[in-house]
Amino acid sequence: MARSKNQNGPSKSQRQLRVGELIRRTLSTVLARADVHDPALNAMSITVAEVRTSSDLKIATVYVMPLGGSGKDEAIEALKRNKGELRRLLGKDLKLKYLPDLRFVIDQTFDQMDATREMLARADVRRDVEKAEDDGPMDGDGA
């Protein structure tokens, strides 16, 4: 039987979710303690928002955002430059048979939330939302 899929692709296994969360917490701690031997990276405050692992746990995509939202490119470059040391530090704390390859990308969640908030604040959208609320619940029975 085929595994059910949602609109965002195949659902993540419990192991993928657990390993992703372990990597996220450990990376957050490593970055907060400034354990990396790179003054440029240690000078940045970087939030690790989420870690998504591939189904075979060989690749971990790390979604990050520098505090304040500025210096995104510099943060990604610093993380990529120190990827080997970050993997080594992760390996010391995590007891995994294979440590995934780390890929760093900027977390777009906050930008998407801002765009949605701006869209909902527009007068034409607000008018449509208020009209839908005045019409009452839409239950599909035509009444």
From Swiss-Prot:
Disulfide bonds: none
Pfam families recorded: RBFA
The keyword Secreted is annotated on this UniProt entry: no
Biological processes per GO annotation: maturation of SSU-rRNA
Compartments in which it is found: Cytoplasm
GO cellular component, one term: cytosol
Keyword line: Cytoplasm, Ribosome biogenesis
UniProt superkingdom: Bacteria
InterPro entries: KH_dom-like_a/b, RbfA, RbfA_dom_sf
Gene Ontology molecular functions: ribosomal small subunit binding
Principal location class: cytoplasm
Coiled coil: none
NCBIfam families: PRK00521.2-5, rbfA
Function field: One of several proteins that assist in the late maturation steps of the functional core of the 30S ribosomal subunit. Associates with free 30S ribosomal subunits (but not with 30S subunits that are part of 70S ribosomes or polysomes). Required for efficient processing of 16S rRNA. May interact with the 5'-terminal helix region of 16S rRNA.
Family membership: Belongs to the RbfA family.
Assembly information from the UniProt record: Monomer. Binds 30S ribosomal subunits, but not 50S ribosomal subunits or 70S ribosomes.
Protein's recorded name: Ribosome-binding factor A
Lineage, uppermost ranks: Bacteria, Pseudomonadati, Pseudomonadota, Alphaproteobacteria, Rhodobacterales
Gene coding for it: rbfA
